[in-house]
Amino acid sequence: YWDFLDFPDSLTVNSGQLSVSFPVTVKPGSAAQAGFVALTCTANGLDSSACFTNFRKYAQTDFGIPSGTTITWPLMYPNVLRFHYLAFPAMSRYIPLNQPDAIMSAKNPILARTSDAYKGTTLFMPVVRSMSPCQRALLRAYLTGEPWQPPQ
């Protein structure tokens, strides 16, 4: 059990209401943590109506890289692609994730498939959603040559 998110203990949903919104905030000191938090829902407090959903929290980090740095392969690979290369070896059939030339050759498709435009679709990469926004930003800085700016 991870305790790094604050959200209301209970919430009233009116009859016929199709959606609900509520604030979810990160607890102080937990920015570097990552994991899942379950939200259990019941109707009128009845256990028979129970269901749950998960919140996923990604770690917020700058990888120890100063803002404005030009990102090179040695800065990006161990922080972003190495995990995916080791965890998903079948991916190397399409793009060898451990080869800088192959990554740069596939720059445009990688930028497209890791962009927010694909979020929420089956085309968003990686399919397992294991790449944090900070990792995607580092990969984007490497591929575009833009100076590194960690997401806030």
Task: Annotate each language-model stretch with its function.
Residues Y1-Q152:
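Aromatic- and Gly/Pro-enriched helix-to-coil junctions and flexible linker segments
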